[in-house]
Swiss-Prot record:
It catalyses: chorismate = isochorismate. This is Isochorismate synthase 2, chloroplastic. It is an enzyme of class 5 (isomerase). GO terms for molecular function: isochorismate synthase activity.
Amino acid sequence: MASLQCSFHFLGTNPKKYNPSSIFQSYSRTSFTKLSSRVSRQRFLRCTLSMNGCEADHKAPLGTVETRTLSTVPSPAAATERLITAVSDLKSQPPPFSSGIVRLQVPIEQKIGAIDWLHAQNEILPRSFFSRRSDSGRPDLLQDFSSDNGSSDHNPVSVAGIGSAVFFRDLDPFSHDDWRSIRRFLSSKSPLIRAYGGLRFDPTGKIAVEWEHFGSFYFTVPQVEFDEFGGSSMLAATVAWDNELSWTLENAIEALQETMLQVSSVIMRLRRESLGVIVVSKNHVPSEGAYYPAVNNALEIIKDKHSPLSKVVLARSSRIITDTDIDPIAWLARLQCEGQDAYQFCLQPPGAPAFIGNTPERLFHRKHLGVCSEALAATRPRGDSKVREMEIERDLLTSPKDDLEFSIVRENIREKLKTICDRVVVKPHKSVRKLARVQHLYSQLAGQLKREDDEFNILTALHPTPAVCGCPVEEARLLIKQIESFDRGMYAGPIGFFGGGESEFSVGIRSALVEKGLGALIYAGTGIVSGSNPSSEWNELELKISQFTKSLEHESALQPIN
C-alpha cells in the first residue's frame, strides 16, 4: 500500500480521480504518441518525489511560511556547502509546526547564468526554468498601478530549479480551489518562494501520451533553486511539509538532503551557438495539403453572416527526428541568446519530455493590485537592410487584414480587463514590436485589481487570448477541436509563476516538446481572419519555427567559469 501511495504522489493526481486505463483508451494517438509509448519514460532515475499540494485542505493555513537568508559567499561551491550545513541545522532544530515551508537562501557574489547552472545538474528531475524578458524601451504601465516601490534588483532575471519541495498537478481543469492550494504556500513576506509551471491550452481536451505527465496543470516549488540577478546570483533550498498529507518535515528534509548531494558546483558556460545535430526527417500535422483546406474551411465560416466567428488560430505540430538526441537546455540557451526580448522557459516533470519555449508574448504580470497584459498579433519577417526594414514595417502598420487581426486581440483583452479592474489604460494604441527574426503589431494594457484575490480571475479572464485561440473564444475553441488533429498540450497555454506579492505568466507559443530518442515536436500557429491566404499563413508557420530549426546547425561548446 505504501508503494501504491507513492506512485500516486508521483503521478500528481488524487487516487480517487485517477484512472490510467481510461486515459490510455481515450486519446487520439499521433505518430509521435505511438513511438513515445514504446520508449521507457523512466530514464531519469534521479528524481525527487514530494507531496501534491492539491490534495491538502486549501482552507487550512500553513503553520509557517518563511525565508532565511544566510551570509554571502564567493562561489556556488561555497553556497552549496553553506546550504548543506543549514539544512542539517534545520533538521536538528525543526520548526514546531505540523505544516509549513522554509526557504534557505545564500547570496553569491558572482553573476552566473541560471541556465548554465541547470545544464550542470545532469538531468535531475523534475526541473524548471523561467527567464523574464527585457522590457527596456517600452513604457512600464504597471508602475502606475502597483504600490510596490522596491528595487527591481531584488527580482531574479532567470530562475532554474531541480527537485520538488511541493508540486501541484491534476487531470481536472485548474480551479479556484487549486489556486488557493498554491497560494497557501506563498507569502508576500517570502517573495522568492514561487510556484513555477503552466496550464494546458484546452483543459477539457483529451490528453495525448506525450503530455500525460503534465496533467491539466503542473506547478512546482523547486527543492533547489538557482537565481540569476543583474550582478549576482543566489542558491536556495526549500523544504515544505504537511503532516495531513503524510509528508512530514523529516520526510522533506531527507528528500532535500538526497537532492543536495547530487547538486554540481562545477558550472560550465554554454556557448550560445547552434547545436551540432542534423534533422533527418520532418513531419507536419497537418500537412501542407491538409492545411490549405482547413484554412479555407475556417474562412467560409468567418464569412458566413450567421456566424459570430471573426478569427480562429490554427496551429501546426512539426515533428523532427535528429541524428543525435537534442539537449533541451542547450537548445534553450541557444534560443536565449537571440531572445532577450522574450521569455524562455522549461518544464519537465519526472518521466516527461521537456517543454521549452522562447515566447515574446506576456499573458499578464501582477504586482500587488497592479496588473498588465498586452496585445500581440500579425507577423512579418525582419528586413535585411534599413530600407527593407522600413518597407516591411510600413506594410505591417497599414495592412487592413493585419489591423483587423490586431484590433480583435487588443479590444478583447481590454474588455476582459475591464471585468476585473477599476480602470484600464492602453498605451500605445498600436506599434511595432521587433524581435530577432520577426516583428508584430503590439500594444500594452494595464489596470488595477479590486483586490489581490482576483488573481485567479485574471487567468480565467485572459486565457485563452484571441492571439492564440480566436474570437469569440468559445466559438473559436470549438472550431479548433474540430479541425486540429493533435493535442496542443501546454502549447499556447499560460506558462510562468505564482508568487506572494507578484505573479507573471507568458503565453507558451514558439515552443517545443523534446524527448530523448524521439526528437522534438515544434508548435506554431497563425490567426485566420477575413482576407487570410492559406499560402501566406503556411509561410508564416515556417517563419515562426525557423528560430528552432535554424539553431540546430553547427556545434555547441562549453567554456569553464573561473
